[in-house]
Amino acid sequence: MAPVPGSGLAKGLAVTLRTMTRKTVTEQYPDAQPELPPRTRGVIGLFEENCTVCMLCARECPDWCIYIDSHKETVPAATPGGRDRSRNVLDRFAIDFALCMYCGICIEVCPFDALFWSPEFEYAETDIRDLTHERDKLREWMWTVPAPPALDPGAEEPKELAAARKAADKLAAQQQPDQPGPDHPGQPDESGQEGRT
């Protein structure tokens, strides 16, 4: 059956007439800030202490908007006769948010939890060069990162944690033998007499 000419127009007018009498729901932004979900993708924050300069984030970034510079530093041996170690030291960590497409791959591949999503999204600039945030600016965004959500009280404990807890309880039980004394009724105390019952 062919559609009746003008039926689309009638449907559109019907929707308009139905919603015309309802109360408006205009958000008064920026006076009223929106309620953002905890995992909102805003700006990326850097927790510099966790960064080991492994370069995974820069290599996996599809936009190549992460710039990292580092140098190697020799750390003396911790014990006499030990070997000196070399480690990477972070010189520059920058993200160009003019290029970033907010895919989150850099955050997912970071094995040391050095990058986090912040819900902040109001960082517009008048000059495009100011959208390249250096490590000091990225560190400032860490203050806006929300705490991780609480665990569900009804959730099962992870297998590894349950096994570790069971082993710790077993070890504590072995290290704490029952000692007879006046605190335990019916058992002999230090004088050899039976305790009160």
Curated annotation (Swiss-Prot):
GO terms for molecular function: 4 iron, 4 sulfur cluster binding; iron ion binding; NADH:ubiquinone reductase (non-electrogenic) activity; quinone binding. GO terms for cellular component: plasma membrane. Residues 156-169 have a biased composition (Basic and acidic residues). NDH-1 shuttles electrons from NADH, via FMN and iron-sulfur (Fe-S) centers, to quinones in the respiratory chain. The immediate electron acceptor for the enzyme in this species is believed to be ubiquinone. Couples the redox reaction to proton translocation (for every two electrons transferred, four hydrogen ions are translocated across the cytoplasmic membrane), and thus conserves the redox energy in a proton gradient. Binds 2 [4Fe-4S] clusters per subunit. The gene is nuoI2. Its cofactor is [4Fe-4S] cluster. Its main location: membrane. It is a peripheral membrane protein. NDH-1 is composed of 14 different subunits. Subunits NuoA, H, J, K, L, M, N constitute the membrane sector of the complex. It comes from Streptomyces coelicolor (strain ATCC BAA-471 / A3(2) / M145). Belongs to the complex I 23 kDa subunit family. Residues 42-71, 91-120 form the 4Fe-4S ferredoxin-type domain. Signal peptide: none annotated. This is NADH-quinone oxidoreductase subunit I 2.
